[in-house]
Amino acid sequence: MGRLSPGLLLAGLFLAGCAQTAPLSHTATLTQPDMRPDTLADAEELCALVRTDYAFYESRRNIWEAACADLPEKVGPVMNQAEQLQVLETLLDALHDPHASFGTNSGISPRLVPSGADYWLTGNQVVAVRQGSAAAQAGLKVGDRVIAINGRPLDEAMETRLQPKGVAYDAAQKAWALNAAAAGYRNEPRSVTVARMGGPDTLSLENYSVAEPQELVTADMLPGRIGYIRLNNSLGEDATVAAFDAAMDQLKGARAWILDLRDTPGGGNTDVAEPILGHFLGETTGYQRVLPMDEPAWVKQASPHGGWKAEGTVVVLVGRWTGSMGEGLAIGFDGARRGDVFGSDMARLAGGVEEYTLSHTGFPIRLPAYSLAHVYGTPRHEWTPPHQVTADNGDGPDLALQAALAWLGEFSM
């Protein structure tokens, strides 16, 4: 696969996009030696690793080589682990890839996107606000026009994440940097300033209590015998398979189904996702294309699961917080022709990740090492739901669910 062996991780490594990571110390002592040599060695190692193992290197070759050039001149004294990680995080920013991330953090680390974000921007316009988030509670609305992030004008906010400095940035880099800046840093108070009728309105995103669902899966029989199941960021939990099985049994007899994947920013794994899809299959079916860097492409299969097949029409709800394996499950339902997907563009996390450990710092890192695609060939991160509707409407009405219910009502006539 490349020059580092995947899988040599520190205990407690998180799934891509998850918020929980092992924190590092950021307090240097008087006797702390200069950690620059180890940091520089791992920066060079990361540069080489991306060249050999990163699935999207060719599309980012120029910007990555610019970031890796003259590293000894760019790395100053490093006195603690937080500063070590900061050097490597800044280097990794050059990839402008939210699916490439470290498996640890410090108090000065950037928050991850999408799991650490609670609103999404296209240009200066808010296109999604995460339900129940601090942004939703603060009053941020889909359609708001943002004029500052954390007190900085948008161009200045983007500059905090654009790397390397002194080069020209394309539209994709700027779009990534804008949403990364909106997620902010762990040590930085967050706010967003929007243009309102009465003038600029700065909304603080601090000191809000955000409730986390306690159940892996939420299930309910909606009027009209529509079985509704929502995954609560649980595609990486082995226990989700049994919880989903129980939810299906609870809703047995539903005439139609809604599978809500709008809260899956942390991704997950196929051992959980395939049994979920399998409940709705009558035979083994291809659901996702895998495109390794150095092997022929092949199609991932899912098999029937659960002892009985769920009949009836299926709607899958997705949005900006549908990430990684959540995206794979959405394109799987579409590719298997077993579900109609409603919502907005998803998190657009490209490829499938492998896990590595850098040799000198021991920091775990995850990089997309192979591409993934819809069975019909569209790269997963470029695929768009056929039924477009606002998926993440903050504290407003659930427009995607309303659209799904209306469509299912028409379908039954």
What are the language-model segments listed below?
Residues R225, G253-W257, E311-V314, R337-D340:
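Loop/turn elements at helix/coil->beta-strand transitions in domains of secreted/extracellular proteins
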Residues G7-G17:
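Bacterial N-terminal signal peptides
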Residues P265-L317, W321, G351-G362, A369-V375, ...:
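Gly/Ser/Thr-rich loop/hinge elements
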Residues G132-A134, P153-L154, V210-E212, N233-E237, ...:
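Solvent-exposed loop/turn segments at secondary-structure junctions
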